């Protein structure tokens, strides 16, 4: 699969083909300082044209909280195929739990390409006809 990618400028670190794993790291496009309890959109310096029928899932790297003390406010970002303009640059929505500095080039999040959900028709019924499994957190408690 080929994906067209545009970089914010010539100083952005180019994304190389991944050698292992299923996720591709993204880097901060500029230095960002965030105070505790502050929200900022961290620019990632890339815009992409995703293939028709696909979307990108963007999540923090496993070390993002440890290294920077930030969490991604929407848990997982979804970028669909329509977000593909020359100025549709990607961002990481960060909420800081401590004062922090993210430097240009720091690996802050990762993404993978996924097929979009097919068209779904929801059919209302009075009963599903299945046994109840249990509530939240009930798996493995019996």
UniProtKB/Swiss-Prot annotation:
Record note on pH: Optimum pH is 5.5.
Disulphide bond pairs: none
Co-factor note (free text): Binds 1 Mg(2+) per subunit, coordinated entirely by the nucleotide and ordered water molecules.
Tell me the GO BP annotations in alphabetical order. Answer: dUMP biosynthetic process; dUTP catabolic process
Q: What is the enzyme's class at the highest EC level?
A: hydrolase
What molecular functions are annotated in GO for this chain?
dUTP diphosphatase activity; identical protein binding; magnesium ion binding
| KW Magnesium (keyword) present | yes
Q: Which cofactor does it need?
A: Mg(2+)
Phenotype seen when the gene is deleted: No visible phenotype; double yncF-yosS deletions (both encode dUTPases) are also viable.
**Pathway entry:** Pyrimidine metabolism; dUMP biosynthesis; dUMP from dCTP (dUTP route): step 2/2
Q: Please name the catalytic residues of this protein.
A: 80 (proton acceptor)
Q: Which residues form a coiled coil?
A: none
Report residues binding dUMP: 62, 74, 83, 91
InterPro entries named among the record's database cross-references: dUTPase, dUTPase-like, dUTPase-like_sf, dUTPase_trimeric
- Which UniProt key words apply to this protein? Hydrolase, Magnesium, Metal-binding, Nucleotide metabolism
EC no. given is: 3.6.1.23
A single GO CC term, please?
protein-containing complex
Reactions listed under catalytic activity: dUTP + H2O = dUMP + diphosphate + H(+)
**Record's domain comment?**
The uracil deoxyribose moiety interacts with the protein through Ile-79 and Tyr-83, which discriminate against the ribose form of the nucleotide.
Per the entry, what this protein does is:
Involved in nucleotide metabolism: produces dUMP, the immediate precursor of thymidine nucleotides and decreases the intracellular concentration of dUTP, so that uracil cannot be incorporated into DNA. The Ser-62 side chain changes its position upon ligand-binding to make contacts with the nucleotide phosphates.
User: What is the protein's quaternary organization?
Assistant: Homotrimer.
UniProt record similarity statement: Belongs to the dUTPase family.
Q: What is this protein called?
A: SPbeta prophage-derived deoxyuridine 5'-triphosphate nucleotidohydrolase YosS
> Lineage, please?
Bacteria, Bacillati, Bacillota, Bacilli, Bacillales
């Amino acid at each position: 699969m080929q994906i067209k990618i545009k970089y914010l400028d010539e100083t952005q670190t180019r994304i190389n083909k991944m050698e292992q794993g299923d996720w591709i790291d993204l880097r901060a496009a500029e230095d960002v300082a965030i105070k505790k309890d502050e929200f900022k959109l961290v620019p990632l310096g890339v815009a992409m044209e995703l293939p028709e029928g696909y979307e990108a899932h963007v999540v923090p790297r496993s070390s993002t909280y440890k290294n920077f003390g930030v969490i991604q406010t929407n848990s997982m970002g979804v970028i669909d195929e329509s977000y593909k303009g020359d100025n549709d640059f990607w961002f990481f929505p960060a909420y800081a739990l401590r004062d922090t500095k993210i430097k240009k080039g720091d690996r802050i999040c990762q993404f993978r390409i996924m097929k979009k959900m097919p068209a779904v028709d929801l059919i209302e019924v009075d009963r599903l006809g299945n046994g109840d499994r249990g509530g939240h957190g009930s798996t493995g408690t019996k």
